[in-house]
UniProtKB/Swiss-Prot annotation:
A Pfam family reported for this protein in Swiss-Prot or TrEMBL: Pro_dh
Annotated pathway: Amino-acid degradation; L-proline degradation into L-glutamate; L-glutamate from L-proline: step 1/2
Organism: Caenorhabditis elegans
Keyword entries, A-Z: FAD, Flavoprotein, Mitochondrion, Oxidoreductase, Proline metabolism, Transit peptide
Protein name: Proline dehydrogenase 1, mitochondrial
Family that this chain belongs to: Belongs to the proline oxidase family.
Lineage, top ranks: Eukaryota, Metazoa, Ecdysozoa, Nematoda, Chromadorea
Record's keyword annotation contains Ion transport: no
Induction cue: Up-regulated by infection with P.aeruginosa.
Record's subcellular location: Mitochondrion matrix
GO MF annotations in UniProt: FAD binding; proline dehydrogenase activity
Any one GO BP annotation for this protein: proline catabolic process to glutamate
Enzyme class: oxidoreductase
Signal sequence annotation: none
Amino acid sequence: MQAALIGLNFPLQRRFLSGVLTTTSSAKRCYSGDTGKPYDCTSAEHKKELEECYNRLDLSFENTKEAFKSKSNTELVRALVVLRLCGIQTLVNQNQIILNTMRRVLGKNLFKKTLKNTFFGHFVAGETEEEVRHVVEKLRNYGVKSILDYSVEADITSQEATDKTVKGTSVATVKPAAMTPVVDAKTLETTRERYTVHEEFGDRRQGVSSARTYFYEGEEQCDKNRDIFKDSINAVASATKNEGFVAVKITALGRPQLLLKLSEAIVQTQNFFKALTGGMSLQEGRLTSQEFYKRLGELGVKTDTESVKKFFDEVDFDSDGIVDLHGWNHILDDHVKLGQLFQVLNIKTGSLEPLIQNLSNEEEQEFRNMVRRTLDVAEYAIEKGVRIMVDAEQTYLQPAISKITIEMMKKYNKGRGNIFNTYQAYLKGTLQNMEADMQVARREGWHFGAKLVRGAYMEQERARAKAIGYEDPINDNFEATSKMYESCLTRIADEVHRRGKTNVSVMVASHNEDTVRFALNLMKEKCISPSERVMCMAQLYGMCDQVSFSLGQAGFSVYKYLPYGPVEEVLPYLSRRALENGSVLKKANKERDLLWKELKRRISSGEFKARSSSSS
């Protein structure tokens, strides 16, 4: 899960901390923000469920007796120590040196035991499937479900990471020369630079909080990663009774540099399409056949040629006489080469030209392998009753990742939401991109599944944009990101009303209490009960327990994001978790204060172990 930034939106906080959710609509009638039509609040069962859940929930998230009832006194002490250490900036900044020194001084076995009883035990679900299953079952006893994430990554130096990135650069080129009469040269060049490997940003881990990073280590390793995802699916299936998710990163299943080229081709195609449609937004930009041919004629193209007819047939993907961007390629078609996916009409010659050129046969095969591995994981998960959550990554890789994910949703989300795409609210274009995807889902009739996060790559994204010379993709400040998050949630809730509760779902992945309260308010306002599986919450394992367990025990749908893997190989993850907690905890000490409050309460009342989930 992308890092969830913690902060206080004080007007919202005052609105909610009274312990009662207030809504602007009537208690009996809830209205859609875009239609004004009443939501269906007629189900007595769902109304009763909502009322009972809200009556059980302390919206201040300060009822420590309930929030930490799953923790033993030892676990409370461990959490306090770990979070306190994460708040000491000197220790956090030197955490890798400290860990390496401990490993050398203590020896492998004692070092491993020490970590399992401290940082590893607090932030990681376990090493083996059996250990993970025990944690999953314990969480479920307290109303919390699980998302499994195998968090092993190569422990390599920054120079080694850069070398892997530069060495793996694709020989393929995206040549948008055919677009020059339509798209201005500056736009084409800026796009090319943005989606090119730059050595100073070769280590994709730099300036990243929380998110795991994969570097390409050959096709055999990608096959191993696919099998690891399948093992995660098995673990979820055996322990969660069809309730769980597995987090998947597309960069684990193939060469990231191919995703970079694919992303450039997608964005250059968007540039061309926007120019053809007069600069319309992605969701608005649609042309009838008459408008299409008229526009080409205005550009001096002979419209009665076979090439133009073929081009129109390719971009009119559903044969409805309308051209739109979403049908311009078929990523998952195993019989179509990557070099053939993006055919662009050369305005000067009137002929079709491939946008991606000079792909070697080896690269073509690597891309097909990546697609096959992705589909293997998806189909295996569906067979086991487990859902897939595709993680978002950097903006220069995300167009390709999103396109692959949306194509998977088209293929596998016909009956229920098996595949979820991730949207990062700290990006300026998130609402527009999500709107375009929802429009396609509505038109084609498949389930739209979204995970909404704040984002994990802010520092790197801003530095890269400034150095290379393109617009900063990140919102200006925390408040703008919060506004984007809330706008996306509101828009999804309206889409639920428009399409029905079985066709749209969203996971609110956030540690921000105000964001969670906003989502809860939407559920009440739009009459969405927890059992309808439309809106759920998620937090990282070892963080924000006062929110997760309060929600779970009140009856809301909530998940913990569970990293797991061998101690030694999860150290890079633990290092980032320490860094993230350091930046968060120096601003907000609420969780630590609540843990200390609960420990003192137990000591004063003579309680020496966690209560069972069934006790009152």
